[in-house]
Amino acid sequence: STSNDKPDQGYENTLVTAGVNTSFEQYQDLFANLGLSASYDDLRTTGAASDSLKKQSGDFSELAGNYGFRLDKRNRTFMPTDGSIISFNQVLPIYADKSYIANTFAASNYNQFTENVVNATKFYVSAVNGVGGDHVRLSKRRFLSTKRLRGFKRGKVGPRDGLDHVGGNYAAALNFEANLPNLLPEATKTDVGLFLDFGNVWGADYDSSIE
C-alpha cells in the first residue's frame, strides 16, 4: 500500500497493489519475465486542485498482465566493465476501470576506456497511453527517478496542472557516466564518478493545454 498524500498540491492518492512475477532464461543471455498484478487506486482531490484534476478523482480497480525480455551481455552484474544490457517491458489490461497500455525500453552499454576509467551510456524511454478513449490515471503516469535524472527532485519534472506536477504520458532519459574505481585508495571505500544526464517528461492526455 502506498499513500501519496499531498493536500498542498491538490490531491491525496492511496494505491494498494499485489502481484506475482516469474523470470527465466529463455536462451543464453536472453531472459523472459511474466507477471500478473492487481491494484486498487483511491484518488481524492482538494479544493486547491484544478477542474481537470478533479475530474480524475474516484476509486479505480484493475487487473493487468505484464511481460518482458532482457538481453544481458555484461561481463558481470555488479559494476560491469564491458558489455551491454537491453530490456523491453509491456503492461496490458485484463480488466480495468480505466484501461491503459505501458511500454518501457532501456539499454545500457559499458566499456573500459582505460584501467582507471569505465564508461557507461544509458538510454531509457517509457510511454503509457489510455485505451478506448480512457485517460491515464495520475498514479500510472510517467516520472523520471533520481537515478535517471540526477540533480532534480523526483516528480518535479514534466507537465504541471496549475502548481501540481502530474507526470506525463512519456518519459525519456539519456545518461553518460565515467566511473573512476581506482582514483582513491581502496581503504576509503569511496567511489568517484562523473555523469551527464538529459531527460524529459511530457504529454498530458486529459488536458492538451498542459505543458
Task: For each feature predicted by the language model, list its residue ranges.
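Short, glycine/acidic-rich beta->alpha junctions
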Residues: 12-14, 99-103, 211
